[in-house]
Amino acid sequence: LIVREMAEILMFRLTEKKLVTESITLEVGYDRENVDKGGYRGLTQTDRYGRIIPKAAHGTVRFDAPTNLGSTLINESAKLFERITDPALTVRRITINANKVTPDEGIYQVDFFTDTKKLEKEKKLQQAMLGIKNKYGKNAVLKASSYEEGATMRQRNAQIGGHSAGGSDGKLQK
């Protein structure tokens, strides 16, 4: 759920800046409690504090064409997370990055099976949602999943650089 939310944030950032990405990279860092409990026997690494932790999971997905479409970014990041993560381990940190980011020039090679009208409709919807968020705050338009247990989107939207910004509506308090 959190990875899907992070991919959605990435989608809005790319859309706002009129950028597209050729691939995304996901890194999942595990908590040291996995080693401290004594049951973990996999690969390890040393963190910046000198503690032994499980080796982080890392993976990249390349797209057929550069994109900033939410459907692609969200679905592919969720699949990548499922593929690279050890479900038996406690996750401490998740990082998602867009790679080979270029300006969105709107002209990309598509195959005969791509529904270009559907893609354009999705882009327009993303731009409309972004306009609403910019005008009324980041929490003005949310998916229902942002209200599920374990979701962090609403709290993330009220932060600046990972720290509390004061308001729960995603707007800065004056």
Residues covered by each model-derived region:
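Basic, low-complexity intrinsically disordered segments
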Residues: 1-174
